[in-house]
Amino acid sequence: AQVRLAQVPARFEDAFIDLLGGGPGGTSTLAERLPPVELGSDVAVSCRNLTKRFGAFTATDSVSFEVKKGEIFGLLGPNGAGKSTTFKMLCGLLKPSAGEAQVVGLDLRRATGAVKGRLGYMAQKFSLYGLLSVRQNLEFSAGVYGLDTATRRARIAEMIETFDLGGWLDMAPDSLPLGHKQRLALACALMHHPPVLFLDEPTSGVDPI
């Protein structure tokens, strides 16, 4: 099959993305702050015949795949295909009905707690705490992951700067624009430098970061 490239007129959305740094030659503050990860042969995430049943309903049926270190891997499918259920099993939030899975070499059946500390998870529906302010959500995430006091302060300050949250710190997440809600959720997921990051529909409503 042959591939042809053709120039098309610019759209309003293209100019908007370009102004935000998401166009050709644009820079990403987030990418600049994250350490580069080289592709390797080590397996970061693997599952074999992973299945989840809710009574007579099978949400995921014998899912198998491997994700190597440094690889970006996506799950595609219509609503109800089991993508979020698969994520939740890999994050240790749901117990599989059958099959096995490993994250960074840890068996989910035996080391669920340890696995949770080695990954970041940005849920499809916001996993933010509405009764807490933006700052308190960041502080809570840092505390949950057991960061020491000095590291906690440094990481919170870095996340505020990286995701441009400085003007929203005293506001409740529910009062934020959708894009800033997404920024806050991603900041919380990245707080502890996780080697594995699960993103469930992360680009909905978000602008380039």
Residue ranges and their predicted role:
Residues 3-52:
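ABC-family P-loop ATPase nucleotide-binding domain
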Residues 45-209:
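ABC transporter nucleotide-binding domains
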